[in-house]
């Protein structure tokens, strides 16, 4: 079955929360103590934070669909990354996850292309991305879209501080 991409709506809150939690667990679940991970997921990926994000006119989320099932997503919104060059109106790619069973089929590039079309309408906007310092595949992927490293910051889950690179496409 071919995978489809569509924009998320408020009706997708629960499905978005479910895929956000599932993909974060699949990708990073072994990286944090269980209670700290659960607290983080509830604070950031449960239904209410998703509802708030979807209600924000500066945010946009795309869903990767296999029939009626969400198998991936990309979320963007107002930039919150800590960098002195960040400006009002800049956009941050906040989350970009696809279930492992659906990776390496070109679907990530399709999601990114849909996002980039939105990002640059009606005019080109600056893109910011935070990526883990050891996620070399993601760094190469974002470089193909014109992003380069401009800084670093700590991404915090519980008591764990992960070094993240700040990437920017001017």
Please give the residue ranges for each predicted region.
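Active-site acidic-Proline motif in GNAT/NAT acetyltransferases
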Residues: 99-101, 105, 133-134
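Acetyl-CoA-dependent GNAT
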Residues: 3, 7-13, 17-32, 38-101, ...
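C-terminal "cap" of GNAT-fold acetyltransferases
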Residues: 62, 87-91, 125-139, 143-170
